[in-house]
Amino acid sequence: MENVQDFIISILRANPSLRDTRSFLASFGPRPTKLFQEQQSQDIIIPPPPSTPPASTTATPTIPIQPTPSPVITSILNPVYNRTALVKIQGPFTDVQLDSITRGLVYLSKLGLVSVIVVDNDNQPRGDQDERRVIIDEVMRVVSSLEKHGARARPITGAIVRLGPKPGSEDPTSELDFTPPETHTLPPDLTPLRSALRAGEIPVVSPFALDSFCRSVRVDSNDVIAGLSADAPSDFSKEVELAPFRLMIINRHGGIPSYARSGYPHLLINLSSEYQHIHETFREEWRHTHPSALSNLALARTCLAYMPPTSSAIMVSHKSPSSLIGNLITNKPAVSSSLPHALLQGNQRLTPHTPTLLRRGLPVQVFHSVSDIDKIKLNALLEQSFGRKLDSASFYARLEKKLDFVIVAGDYVGAAIVTNEDDPVSGKPISYLDKFAVLPSHQGDGTVDFLWVALHDETYGLGHPFSANPNGGKGGKGEGRDLVWRSRSKNPVNKWYFDRSSGHLRMGSWVLFWCDAEKRLKIEEGRRGSAGLSYVEDWEEGRLRTWAEAVSGIPSSWM
């Protein structure tokens, strides 16, 4: 009963939105009956873990045929669709720690995510005469711990990957932006995995590989996981859903430390635009406190390159196993990376054990001239996002005069347009967020957070060292400026804006939002010391009236 309550509480803590729930059900909910009937001869549905058998058994009465199928029959014809996750358990762990980890993995299996676990032991030296025995013992510990929580698990102590490139494959290294796996698989190698998943068991894999002489040798667990992620979709997805849906790295150190968060972990990483920058800003002391962080970062980039675009990787400490459930349901970081820094650090939302979520992500670019913009693609983005027809002629005529910069995510799947509006009082331009748009197909996949973080770095967060991101913008150099924007009072996105803004002002059918320049606030707080900031500072006097007047005079961009 205690485990059931813990399971339910873990789900409730995820606090999924309506979009999160729909996305989860689309991945794990019942499959259409017609589709299931057509594919049942070739698809293998991974059964859920067995429930505890009843104390006594009785003969099941014959169920008469009814015109309307009963819920039981309907559930049989429409089973919950199970997916697989590649899970790296990077020990060593104590029995108590391992118990916490495996409990979380069993909870995931109840929700439809079946783990393919690869075990590793950082403290076991390579080449030790007892290494094979120690590794196999560790595999058996994991199996026993899983079974203790009611799951069925199968140890796989033989090699299921082979060293070297796959026969017949070309060397694509020069064309890739990630390091390809140093291992590969052949269809017969994964018979143990297929068999375990078919039987409803969680496979627990040893980090062994076959060399060119067909000898089983110990390899890094990253090589096993990368090899599985690269070959599983093409070889096994038709027979069993082995194509990995998530990558989970469970270790003793937690996520990847960030220089922007005083050594606390990154919350969300856009691998396409941040990978090299993380390497460049990784401090020397972290190589001792988080020795496997960069190798796990490389593993995530390799695996996600082969996984579906909606997939993600999570790097989590053994102290935060419940966060795995939240990640599965929402596919989001534990805390949004676009929230204000003061809010994240002021109420202890961030801890050394906060997990890091990693996505393949999208490149982010900053343009300062209208001539650099692809107008056709930007038009399509704005019209799909807002559901309205853009008045292109007047819109771009205004940008020619007022544009400060445009941030573009990927191939125009998201954009933030900032203009310089006239301030009649001070004469200094007002930074105005004219448009913030993300394609509906990319809402919920992290693009919104990637875009807002870049917007922060170019406007109200400018001047901080952590705003020096390589996206073609100001590189963190300059003075931050207040950012202002408006939104319809009935816009459902306003709740998201409330969380990220410094304040808001209702203006009839509109709401005016703003974000204060963070560096100026920091300087003022330091100048006043323990007295803190007053309710209304001198430099705040009259600015809301000025902003409201300037924003109210901006013409509509729509037909």
From Swiss-Prot:
EC number, UniProt record: 2.3.1.1
A GO term from the CC aspect: mitochondrial matrix
Gene3D superfamilies xref list: 3.40.630.30, Acetylglutamate kinase-like
GO molecular function: L-glutamate N-acetyltransferase activity
Subcellular compartments: Mitochondrion
Pathway as given in its UniProt record: Amino-acid biosynthesis; L-arginine biosynthesis; N(2)-acetyl-L-ornithine from L-glutamate: step 1/4
UniProt keyword annotations, A-Z: Acyltransferase, Amino-acid biosynthesis, Mitochondrion, Transferase, Transit peptide
GO biological process: L-arginine biosynthetic process; ornithine biosynthetic process
Catalysed reaction equations from the record: L-glutamate + acetyl-CoA = N-acetyl-L-glutamate + CoA + H(+)
Domain N-acetyltransferase residues, every copy: 362-538
Spans traversing the lipid bilayer: none
Positions of the UniProt region annotated as Disordered: 162-188
Annotated family: Belongs to the acetyltransferase family.
Job description of the protein: N-acetylglutamate synthase involved in arginine biosynthesis.
Protein name: Amino-acid acetyltransferase, mitochondrial
The organism of origin for this protein: Laccaria bicolor (strain S238N-H82 / ATCC MYA-4686) (Bicoloured deceiver)
Taxon lineage: Eukaryota, Fungi, Dikarya, Basidiomycota, Agaricomycotina
